[in-house]
């Protein structure tokens, strides 16, 4: 398959509005036509319409939900096992770190690492926080909220990541 190279003026003019998979966690998995020219991908293949924002949503973007009763973080970590993940609570923040050492895949050797930090709402019960990894690679971090005026127990501690055998119930983008 020949891939047309986009012109520099095109890249400069539309680049900020059409992010590429080149710099996300899928680096090294190969390129598609829409990675190089997302705006023109429908003209190259008129019967196939690729969402212009698909690459942003598929690049490990997390989803944070905070409702009246609980706080939940969904994070796609499909390239990591529970042993590769560290989840810590440091005062009002949760830090999620994933790293796996260099290993061989279809295209050569690859290593991955990420670090995410989220602020916890002040009324989250930090003694009841939990973290699980679904079979499809969705990390779910959650904690119940306590009524206002009740001490939520802020301290530093590690949260173990448990493995679930069923796929995640988180909405897919």
Curated annotation (Swiss-Prot):
Domain sHSP: from-to ranges: 52-162
Name the UniProt record assigns to this protein: Alpha-crystallin A chain
Modified residues annotated as Deamidated glutamine in this record: 6, 50
Organism expressing this protein natively: Neovison vison
Gene this protein is translated from: CRYAA
Residues carrying Deamidated asparagine: 101, 123
A Pfam family reported for this protein in Swiss-Prot or TrEMBL: HSP20
Modified residues (N6-acetyllysine): 70, 99
Modified-residue entries (Phosphoserine), positions: 45, 122
Region (Disordered): 144-173
Taxonomic lineage of the native organism: Eukaryota, Metazoa, Chordata, Craniata, Vertebrata
Residue numbers binding Zn(2+) 3: 154
Keyword annotations from UniProtKB, A to Z: Acetylation, Chaperone, Cytoplasm, Eye lens protein, Glycoprotein, Metal-binding, Methylation, Nucleus, Phosphoprotein, Zinc
Localization (cell): Cytoplasm; Nucleus
Task of the protein: Contributes to the transparency and refractive index of the lens. Acts as a chaperone, preventing aggregation of various proteins under a wide range of stress conditions. Required for the correct formation of lens intermediate filaments as part of a complex composed of BFSP1, BFSP2 and CRYAA.
């Amino acid at each position: 398959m020949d891939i047309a190279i986009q012109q520099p003026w095109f890249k400069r003019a539309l680049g900020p509005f059409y992010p590429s998979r080149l710099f996300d966690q899928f680096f090294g998995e190969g390129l598609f036509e829409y990675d190089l020219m997302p705006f023109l991908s429908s003209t190259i293949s008129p019967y196939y319409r690729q969402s212009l924002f698909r690459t942003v949503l598929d690049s490990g973007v997390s989803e944070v939900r905070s409702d009246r009763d609980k706080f939940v973080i969904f994070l796609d970590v499909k390239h990591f096992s529970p042993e590769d993940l560290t989840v810590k609570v440091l005062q009002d923040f949760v830090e999620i770190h994933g790293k796996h050492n260099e290993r061989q895949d279809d295209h050569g050797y690859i290593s991955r690492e990420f670090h995410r930090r989220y602020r916890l709402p002040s009324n989250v019960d930090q003694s009841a926080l939990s973290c699980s990894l679904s079979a499809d690679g969705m990390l779910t971090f959650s904690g119940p909220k306590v009524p206002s005026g009740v001490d939520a127990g802020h301290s530093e501690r590690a949260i173990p990541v448990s493995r679930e055998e069923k796929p995640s119930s988180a909405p897919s983008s």
